[in-house]
Design a protein with these regions (language model features):
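Negatively charged, low-complexity tracts enriched in Asp/Glu with abundant Ser/Thr
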Residues: 1-24
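Mixed-charge, Lys/Arg-enriched low-complexity segments
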Residues: 2, 47-92
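A generic structural micro-environment signature
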Residues: 7, 33, 61-64
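Generic alpha-helical secondary structure signal
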Residues: 11, 15, 29, 42, ...
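Short amphipathic beta-strand and strand-loop transition segments with alternating hydrophobic
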Residues: 24-31
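A short, structured beta-strand/loop element
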Residues: 32-54
Length: 92
């Protein structure tokens, strides 16, 4: 799997609400020998700790996955809810 960083967003610390963190929005590519299949990976880096989650096999259409990734980035969707948002967007 190839993971390519497309967007990165910095969040500041807000006392009792949010930790300082960096969120990376990435496209994943898997070549199964016949075609390329794309997914989305989001990673959050907080003080030397990194969490990441991936939704694989979203589509073979790069532009569709790229548009979903842009939506997640522009709306600051984080690692907790991005899987549900992707599912909703694919079902529209």
């Amino acid at each position: 799997m190839i993971i390519k960083n497309v967007y990165s967003r910095e969040f500041s610390k807000i006392d009792n609400i949010q930790k300082r963190k960096t969120v990376n929005y990435n496209i994943c590519e898997v070549n199964n020998g016949i075609s390329k299949i794309y997914g989305i990976n989001i990673s959050e880096i907080t003080m030397n700790k990194m969490k990441e989650k991936t939704v694989e096999n979203i589509s073979s259409n790069y532009y569709k996955v790229s548009n979903i990734l842009q939506f997640l980035y522009e709306n600051s969707i984080g690692i907790i809810s991005f899987k549900d948002i992707i599912e909703d967007l694919l079902n529209e």
